Amino acid sequence: MSNLPHLRPPIVASAVLRATAAAVCLLAGAAFAPAHAADAITAGSITNSPPMISYAADGTTLQGAIVDLAAAMSLQMGRTIVFKAIPFNGLLPAMQAKNIDITFTLMNDTPERQKVIDFVDFFNLGTKLLVQKGNPQHIDGLDTLCGKTVSTVQGSTQNLLVDEADAACKKAGKAGIENLKYAQPSDARMQVQTGRAAVFFGNSPVMVYLAKTAGDGKIFDVVANREYQPVPLGIGVAKDNTALRDALQKSLNALIADGSYLKILEKHGVEGGAVKTATINGG
C-alpha cells in the first residue's frame, strides 16, 4: 500500500498484454491483432489501487482487474490501450485538454461528471471505511465520525459523502469532520496507518483487498456491514468521440457475453461488482 509507487511514466498496455496475452486469448478466444501507434488508445488512470490497478513487484508492469479488462478489450478492438499515470483530480482536465483518449480507472459514473464526459459502465462498487487494525477509534458508520479526522482522494465522490456527514454532525450540535485530501490514494491511506486520520474513504474492492493483504492483514480493517454510494465505475470518453465510446461498449459487451469478463473479475476476487451489460451513462 504505502510502499506502492506514485506516478510513473506512461505504461504501454502492449507490455502488459505480453504478460497476460496467453490468459486473455484463452478467455477472449481471439488472436491478438497488433495495433499501430496511431491507433493506440491513451487511458488515464491512477495506478495504486489494488486489486483493480497497481504496479507489480518489478515497479513497471501494471496488473489488476482493470489492466486485464483493458488487455482483453484491446484484443477485441485490435487497438492497444496505453495507460498513463495521472492523479485522480487531473483526469478530467487531461481529458478536456485531449492529453488522453479515455479514463480507465476507479471513477464513478455520476450525473455531474456526465455533463463533461460520457461513460461506458464496467463495474459496480460502493464506498467502504478503512480503519486501523482492531478499529481502535470504534468507528461504526458516518455518525461516529463527528470530531474525527478522515482522509480522501482529491476529486473523488467520497468527498461528497464526507461533506454530508460533516453537515449532519454540525446540525446535531456536534463537532465537524476534518477531511485531509490527497492526490494519491496511498498517501491518504497512510494517514490511517499512522493514526493521523481515523478513516480513509475508498472504493470497496480496494478497501477489502488492503484489509486482507497489507502487512499480511495486520494493518487495516474495514468497517463491517457498512457500504455507501453504490454507483457504477465507468470508462470516461469525450462527448465528441462517440465512435470510440461505442467501440469500447461493444468490446466490453462481447467479453460479458462470452464469459471472459466474469473470469477476469473472478481472477482478482472482485466478481461481486460484475455488471450484466455495459451501459452508457448509467450512473
Give residue ranges: language-model regions.
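Sec/Tat signal peptide C-region and signal peptidase I cleavage site
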Residues: 31-37
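Extracytoplasmic small-molecule ligand-binding "clamshell" domains
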Residues: 38-106, 258, 267
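Periplasmic-binding protein-like
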Residues: 47-49, 124-131, 212-250, 268-283
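Ligand-binding cleft/hinge of the Venus flytrap
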Residues: 55-56, 71-77, 158-181, 211-215
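Short helices/loops that flank or line small-molecule/ion binding pockets
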Residues: 72-76, 84-85, 89-102, 116-117, ...
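Ligand-binding clefts/hinges and TM-proximal coupling segments of bilobed small-molecule sensing domains
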Residues: 80, 157-173, 253-283
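A ligand-binding cleft/hinge motif common to bilobed small-molecule-binding domains
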Residues: 90, 106-114, 161-165, 198-229
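Flexible hinge/capping segments at coil-to-helix
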Residues: 132-150
